[in-house]
Amino acid sequence: MKILVLASRVPDRDGRADQRTVFRLLEFLAQRGHECHLVALAPWDGAGNDRDSVAELCATMRIFPQGRVRAAFTGLTCRLAGYPFQVGAMWNQEMARAVGRLLNELEPDLVYAHLIRTAEYVREKTAAPRILAMQVAQSLNLDRMARHRQNLLSRMFYRLELAAVSRYEPAIASSFDFNTVISTHDRDAIGLPAGSVWLVPHGVDTHEFHPREQEAEATGPVIFSGMLDTPTNVEAVRLLLSEIWPRVIARLPWAQLRIVGRNPSPSVRRMVRRAGVELRASVQSIAECMADAAVAVAPMRIAAGLQNKVLEAMASGLAVVATPEALEGIGARAGTEAVLASSSARFAEAVVRLLSDPERRRAIGRRARAFIEREWTWEHHWRRLEGRMLMAVASAGQSQTDTRARF
């Protein structure tokens, strides 16, 4: 297949969740012999620096810078016109013209737009079938942000964005030939009929994230991982350090906490410094940081879709303590393949019990790894998506043949 791929950030193997997903998809499609043509934005946050690796996976690659001032202007302009701010912030006229030219010049077999932020570039019907990879219910994520952010102005902004996105998601989905989300929970939150959307979850690299030959010591650290400048993870760190970890230390003074991830925000650095826990920023390998960990934690309250940090920890053979929001869509059995905790007190108690019981911790970790190997490899999910892509292309080709035959 010849596929035109649109992304709101340059794909990156080790970047944010959306960047990693598109990178892995391009990697899979290239290995399968498909011809991918990438058009992406390079936003103001500098995300996606390993462009050479991306270029190797694509027949062509066009990247368009999107500065902070431009994003703010187009975001506000589009918001006043009724569109979500995030859709406007990722609108770039030069990219729009390039997409139009490529549709005419390449005549792709398929168009794949990743996230609603890229939907407007190919909203109008094209000769090739169009897939909108919605991935997560942004409305669900925004609702949780509006409820849990500490800053009043932030809560007001997210409430306004929530109203716009709640209208936009089902409307834009109906404009595309096919839609994908990563879980039934996201599908239902958007309000999409069960038969109108493909379920295409994320995956995890089980070669990179794997159990270590030597078991972690009983005093090994508890680990939290993720991009440390996103609202989702900043709020999780705040909850962990203010409400959960003090309870753990009160019971187990020897316990250690390690927070790992790229781009820690100033607020994360302040919280870590006050709490006196370990911070490993901008690490080369999250997997290596998990090697000697005893337990992984995911105290997410602001989240939608799937949490890669949970999949990675489970693949590494770690027992994971997670909130219901962090386990959404994964399907792990609570108490068997992961530990569910719905309050700060219960979360702390679960961590204490696992640190105090190495045998139970190892048993949960072994079952978690087996679960990931069965259900959550990238290859498993991408092969299903590829099959659906091929069917969509074949169906479109048959329709065109039938149309020509009638005339």
Model-based region annotation:
Residues D177, A291-G305, S316-A319:
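Acidic donor-binding loop of glycosyltransferase active sites
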Residues R360-R374, H381-R384:
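A short, well-ordered alpha-helix in the C-terminal region of glycosyltransferases
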Residues I131-L132, S139, Y158-P211:
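Donor nucleotide-sugar binding/catalytic pocket of nucleotide-sugar-dependent glycosyltransferases
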Residues M1-R62, N104, A250:
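N-terminal subdomain of nucleotide-sugar transferases
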Residues S8, R68-G88, I131-P170, M227:
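Acceptor-binding helix/loop patch of EC 2.4 sugar-transfer enzymes
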Residues K309-E312, A319-T323:
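Short hydrophobic beta-strand element within catalytic cores of glycosyltransferases
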Residues S174, L199-D292:
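Conserved catalytic-core segment of nucleotide-activated headgroup transferases in glycan assembly
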Residues A338-A345, R353-P358:
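Conserved acidic donor-binding segment of nucleotide-sugar-dependent glycosyltransferases
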